[in-house]
Amino acid sequence: MIDKIQILDNNIIELAKTFHTEQNTKIAKFLTEFGGKKGVIAFTIITMIIILIYYMKKSKEKKLHKEEDVSMFKARITGYAVALSVPITLGIAVVTKTVIKMLVNRPRPNAFPEIMVETGKSFPSGHSIGIATMVTILIYFVIISDMNRVLKYILVTLLILFSIVIASTRLYMGVHYLSDVIAGLTLGYIIGT
């Protein structure tokens, strides 16, 4: 089974090479940053702000409806707690990724050094875990929001596609195998929930 996965992984890297152009490489290098440390930190901050705004709005709605001050206070405290859970969830993703990388100890392919060379271990993809975790948290807030259903479906679909595109850049650049990326996305979606 492992041999078949490795054969598929190698074939996907060869397939990725057929898409290499100067323009595609520029795009991939730009997009991959969304799954890197700076990108995930930015996503974390944006997500925390969205959460705080959402719960502050809920708190104001309670005030407009002349509900008890306790109810408004609960909405605000919930907002702060949920916002703080975002970096905690991301921390869990980072620890999980680090432990699995140490246990599996899979070398990176670094198949296209002219495009990018990464250090560290390959399995699972940290970019994939990071972006999938953040996207899953955002999806949750899209789902519970007051948006109409069609807009929710569109946003959820776009967020999932975005995470897949970011993960795919790691294949394009030859710094991860397909199985690394699939494992990273799967772990990120699970941890994000």
Write out the residue ranges for each language-model feature.
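Transmembrane helix-loop junctions and nearby membrane-interface residues
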Residues: 55, 59, 102, 167, ...
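Membrane-interface loops
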Residues: 57-61, 65-149
